[in-house]
């Protein structure tokens, strides 16, 4: 695992999948800034997505991790922020492609479609995959 990566993580509702993701990041010593149900601040999904996106935009975090029921809404909100490249990734292959080919910096997860048993693999793939510099010209 690559160390010294900071995450801002947010969800509007608690779920086992969100808890597994948080525990995985803590276990692997990734610093976290938490929003929404994770922080007990009662923010809705729109505000959670905005706060996580601002953290990444302002370099308070290297990556954002957003959860909502479909994952679509938080991803759309995140992509409204300059410099944010949010990708909805519900499996390892999509997470790898989003990082490699699109240099995505915010990971959206749909709670209705990701199995609890898959979340660690998605996060691991996201963290270990580096952007392919030859592809960056296509997204800038």
Regions found by a protein language model. Name each.
Residues 48-70:
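Short, structured active-site "lid" loops
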Residues 6-7, 60-64, 83-85:
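Short active-site oxyanion
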Residues 31-43:
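A short beta-strand-loop structural module common to alpha/beta enzyme folds
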Residues 8-10, 14-17, 92-140:
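C-terminal binding/interaction regions
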Residues 1-2, 56-60, 99-101, 115:
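Solvent-exposed alpha-helices and their adjacent loops that cap or buttress functional pockets
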Residues 1-30, 138:
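Small-residue-rich anion-binding loops in enzyme active sites
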Residues 66-67, 72-108, 112:
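Mid-chain, well-packed structural core segment of small domains
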């Amino acid at each position: 695992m690559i160390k010294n990566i900071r995450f801002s993580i947010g969800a509007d509702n608690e779920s086992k999948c969100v808890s597994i993701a948080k525990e995985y990041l803590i276990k692997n010593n990734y610093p976290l800034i938490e929003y929404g149900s994770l922080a007990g601040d009662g923010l809705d999904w729109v505000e959670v997505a905005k706060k996580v996106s601002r953290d990444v935009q302002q370099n308070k975090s290297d990556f954002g991790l957003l959860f909502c029921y479909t994952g679509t809404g938080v991803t759309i909100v995140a992509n409204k922020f300059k410099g944010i490249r949010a990708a909805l990734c519900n499996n390892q292959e999509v997470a790898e492609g989003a990082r490699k080919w699109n240099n995505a910096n915010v990971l959206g997860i749909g709670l209705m479609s990701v199995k609890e048993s898959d979340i660690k693999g998605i996060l691991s793939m996201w963290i270990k995959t580096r952007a392919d510099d030859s592809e960056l010209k296509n997204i800038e």
